[in-house]
UniProtKB/Swiss-Prot annotation:
Gene expressing this chain: hisE
Family as reported in the entry's similarity comment: Belongs to the PRA-PH family.
SUPFAM superfamilies named among the record's database cross-references: all-alpha NTP pyrophosphatases
Reactions catalysed according to its record: 1-(5-phospho-beta-D-ribosyl)-ATP + H2O = 1-(5-phospho-beta-D-ribosyl)-5'-AMP + diphosphate + H(+)
The enzyme's E.C. designation: 3.6.1.31
This protein's pathway: Amino-acid biosynthesis; L-histidine biosynthesis; L-histidine from 5-phospho-alpha-D-ribose 1-diphosphate: step 2/9
Keyword Amino-acid biosynthesis: yes
Enzyme class per UniProt: hydrolase
Protein's name according to its UniProt entry: Phosphoribosyl-ATP pyrophosphatase
Cysteine disulfide partners in this protein: none
Source domain of life: Bacteria
Entry's localization field: Cytoplasm
GO biological process terms held by the UniProt record: L-histidine biosynthetic process
Natural source organism: Methylobacterium nodulans (strain LMG 21967 / CNCM I-2342 / ORS 2060)
Length: 107
């Protein structure tokens, strides 16, 4: 079991985002504007879904890592702290998924 966390990855992503785009893939993605990292996130999510459907565990682990990385790049580029997303997840765990979805449909 690893001690590496999503918060650890987030710190690395945000550090690399502050680097020069010539030196950092992360910075290059963010410098390209929100469309580029969002497109990469979508591509990786589709690849993860395909690996899941195919039952390819090794590929799914790899693609899931790509999804998490690219999601953190999108968040960093949008100025959204990981803590804000984690707080939303925590809030959602206080009620059932069905109750949470029903609450979102109310005007």
């Amino acid at each position: 079991m690893t001690t590496f966390t999503l918060a650890d990855l987030d710190r690395i992503v945000r550090s690399r985002a502050a680097a020069s785009p010539e030196e950092s893939y992360t910075a290059k993605l963010i410098a390209a504007g929100p469309g580029k990292p969002a497109k990469k996130l979508g591509e990786e999510a589709v690849e993860a879904a395909i690996a899941a459907v195919q039952g390819d565990r090794t590929s799914l682990v790899s693609e899931a890592a790509d999804v998490l990385y690219h999601l953190l790049v999108v968040l960093a580029g949008g100025g959204i702290p990981l803590e804000e997303v984690m707080a939303e997840l925590e809030r959602r765990t206080t009620q059932s998924g069905l109750a949470e979805k029903a609450a979102r449909r109310r005007p």
